[in-house]
A protein has these predicted regions:
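A glycine/threonine-rich phosphate-anchoring loop and its flanking beta-alpha core
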Residues: 1-38
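Anionic group-transfer/hydrolysis microenvironments
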Residues: 5, 77, 166
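Residues that scaffold the ATP/ADP-binding catalytic core of kinase and kinase-like folds
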Residues: 9-10, 83, 168
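C-terminal charged capping/lid subdomain of soluble metabolic enzymes
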Residues: 14, 20, 116-185
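Active-site segments that bind and position negatively charged phosphate/pyrophosphate groups
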Residues: 32-140
């Protein structure tokens, strides 16, 4: 049982943090969620929004209980996001803020790799929900922090990229290539 009425008691910054994860679910699996949260009166649909997000997580976790394949898509925005949290000593950015920034950065990385350009869509919806979209730290520092990410596999990091909207894919990116991509302007 989920009581969505509790959401009305949250301070706006905490509510917005949660919206970063909602945005993630919309981009990785169900674009209808993005449509719902784009409406000015989206809070009237919170039961449906939460239901859709829980369904996605349930389906993904049931399909990959050991987090060795499909379940990795739940980490969209988290690779760079966790790096940013680490660089900020886990005090300067909230988790939701870091994930929002990470989703935008992952979309920029996807463009550099020739994938679908969702940068503007992700940036716009994050900003509409009071979330930051730009890294407050040098990308070199984020890259160094990402070297310790759980998605690292030997000489690559499994990055979650979205293309097209509603479909997340796991992209193993060699560390050397990743360094070049994320530090190049």
């Amino acid at each position: 049982m989920i009581d969505t009425d509790i959401l009305t008691t949250l301070p706006e910054p905490i509510f917005n943090d949660g919206m970063a994860e909602v945005i993630k679910y919309g981009f990785i699996s169900n674009p209808e969620i993005i449509d719902l949260i784009s409406a000015p009166d989206f809070k009237q649909n919170m039961e449906r929004i939460v239901y859709e997000c829980v369904q996605i997580k349930r389906d993904v976790v049931q399909a990959d209980e050991r987090d060795t394949g499909l379940r990795m898509i739940l980490n969209f925005g988290h690779t760079i996001g966790h790096g940013a949290e680490k660089v900020g000593h886990f005090t300067e950015l909230s988790h939701g803020q870091a994930v929002a920034i990470g989703m935008v950065q992952a979309a920029r990385l996807a463009v550099k790799l020739g994938e679908t350009d969702l940068v503007e869509q992700i940036t716009s919806i994050c900003q509409a929900h009071g979330l930051p979209t730009e890294l407050p730290y040098p990308m070199e520092d984020i890259y160094t922090a990402m070297l310790h990410d759980k998605k690292r596999a030997a000489d690559s990091i499994n990055f979650i990229l979205v293309h097209p909207m509603g479909k997340a894919n796991i992209h193993p990116i060699p560390l050397e290539q990743l360094h070049q991509l994320v530090t190049a302007e």
